[in-house]
């Protein structure tokens, strides 16, 4: 791939300029919220946030022009007609999202209190803008046409999320509280796209024009960025704390133990987070082989912390 490497070296020296008509992006947000103190001590909250972008920023190649031809698979053919460059400009479309959340809280006389929550998010954007430089922002996304300006599911859109917090306080030692806290969460998977291989996109579909860094970023079908959903992730954390007498009057002590991802502590197959590798393009062969997602080590491990708090 000598020619491809030479093209990559050229990309490093590409100029980046600002569209003379560039407008500063902005967002409009509208939020609604309410709290209902329901009978029997239940407290119910609900919130809705609607966001609409304006003058959304997008990077494009400033040197490309369509030849008017397309490949057999329908990919447009480009040629570079100027010095290689990127331009930061405004999208013809805008980012948008809707987020709804609700929760219910109840405290019982037995020493138990609980909070259950649910959140739904539907977020769409033109470009996830994941990076600090123009070239990376250009290639670290999925597209059918690298110059396209379309709104699709966002990398950051997690459709469903459930949360539960349970606290139970009792006294195994007279006058000193023992407190158990269980935090549990379950959320739907991360979005990803079905793409060509890195070689298939950079060379097969676009013949190095533009250079696409051999990322798995060229969609098999148009309009399908992030239309796939990864595996759900469910985990729980446990904290147990015990009040203790201080060394002198007025001092307080508390011993605690925290098990992060107690689900994985109980079973190696539980509490495991799997998601596609960045930038979230997956080939059909990877899907067929069952390797579309990778295990995320840090989030999937269990951890135990113990300590003592002493106040004086």
Where are these regions (language model features)?
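Single conserved hydrophobic/aromatic residue that forms the stacking wall/gate
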Residues: 1-12
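Extracytoplasmic loops and strand-loop junctions of Gram-negative outer membrane beta-barrel proteins
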Residues: 13-18, 81-89, 144-150, 218-225, ...
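P-loop NTPase catalytic cores that bind/hydrolyze ATP
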Residues: 25-54
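Residue-level signature of outer-membrane beta-barrel architecture
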Residues: 36, 106, 168-170, 242-244, ...
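Gram-negative outer-membrane beta-barrel transporters
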Residues: 45-190
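C-terminal beta-signal and adjacent terminal beta-strands/loops
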Residues: 173-219, 230-235, 241-312
